[in-house]
């Protein structure tokens, strides 16, 4: 069985960020990159499986707990860029879980693998803007 593949790109501060998603039955692999390389890789797992309809609230308190595990890269423990990558991975997991619950609440939330190679900086504001761009790209290629 071949995966369903979608791709898109977006310009961010003069750099083209490319995104591709590949869906294999119950797993989604997403790559977001400026170079075609993967610098960091994260796996999102869900602590509770969602097997019955769930009411979504604005604060997303009904979402299952999401564990983010670093598979590749990640840098040092105090590296601000690594922290932003991990936060972004968690946000991607939350976005996909929420969308899955809205569309098909009776179906188990898929596993998500996220590869990132994006221009993180030491500036929290710029990293926040970059995270928004990444979430927009993910939303475009996964829904």
Curated annotation (Swiss-Prot):
Keyword Nucleus: yes
Listed name of the protein: Uncharacterized protein C16E9.19
GO cellular component labels: cytoplasm; cytosol; nucleus
A single GO BP: proteasome assembly
Gene Ontology molecular functions: protein folding chaperone
Keyword entries, A-Z: Cytoplasm, Nucleus
PANTHER family: PROTEASOME ASSEMBLY CHAPERONE 3 (PTHR31051:SF1)
UniProt-listed Gene3D superfamilies: 3.30.230.90
Compartment(s) of residence: Cytoplasm; Nucleus
């Amino acid at each position: 069985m071949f995966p369903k593949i979608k791709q898109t790109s977006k310009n961010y501060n003069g750099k083209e960020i490319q995104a591709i998603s590949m869906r294999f039955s119950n797993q989604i692999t997403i790559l977001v990159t400026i170079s075609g390389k993967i610098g960091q890789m994260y796996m999102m797992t869900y602590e509770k499986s969602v097997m019955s309809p769930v009411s979504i609230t604005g604060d997303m308190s009904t979402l299952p707990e999401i564990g983010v595990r670093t598979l590749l890269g990640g840098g040092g423990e105090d590296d601000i860029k690594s922290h932003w990558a991990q936060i972004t991975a968690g946000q991607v997991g939350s976005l996909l879980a929420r969308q899955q619950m809205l569309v098909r609440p009776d179906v188990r939330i898929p596993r998500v693998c996220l590869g990132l190679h994006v221009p993180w900086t030491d500036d929290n504001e710029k990293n926040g803007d970059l995270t928004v761009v990444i979430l927009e790209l993910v939303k475009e290629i996964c829904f």
